[in-house]
Amino acid sequence: MKKLLPGYTWHRGVAGKKLFLTFDDGPIPEVTPFVLEQLANYNARATFFCVGDNLEKHSDIAQQVLASGHKLANHTYNHLKGWQTSFDEYLQNVQQCQDILATIVSPTTENKPLFRPPYGRITTKQATALRPTYELIMWDVLTNDYDATLSPEECLKQSIAKTQSGSIIVFHDSLKAERNMRYALPRFLEHFTHQGYTFELL
């Protein structure tokens, strides 16, 4: 898949033991505060790819994410599948989320803002239009925490097995993923912290 989709960030080339945790689909009050608590326990930093609708509903939690030293990034306003959405509608939805982020996050000129397409599904035309403005972030470790057929133990086992230095790991701060994520995240953090890894911002 990586070879078929050049021009996306799948992992970070790093020196030393560094990992990049990401959380998709929040923020929501039922789950995101738990994530922040676990990250704090291990002095870990993470990047949250937020749905704009949730940002608007729960801006107080988004502020907590920032205050805890983490980063907020764009995941569209309505969690759209690019393959099933028109070009104009998709770009407008990305911009709508970015407009909400701009009311929460202080502007910076250091790097491009980050965007992750929901489901990893985006057309070539959509990506080409977004790439001059955004860094398009994918992943090399998908925890599948949202999969109800996957046990929490197997979710953790598979996630650990696939992770290496520079990995971009996807968890979800969502109700759908809550069961597996609540089990896997603290144990994932403990495992790699004890191996000398640090968790950094994208």
Regions found by a protein language model. Give the residues of each.
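Alpha-helical scaffolding segments of alpha/beta enzyme cores, especially the outer helices
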Residues: 34-37, 60, 64-67, 92, ...
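Domain-start "cap" segments at the beginnings of catalytic or binding domains
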Residues: 99-137
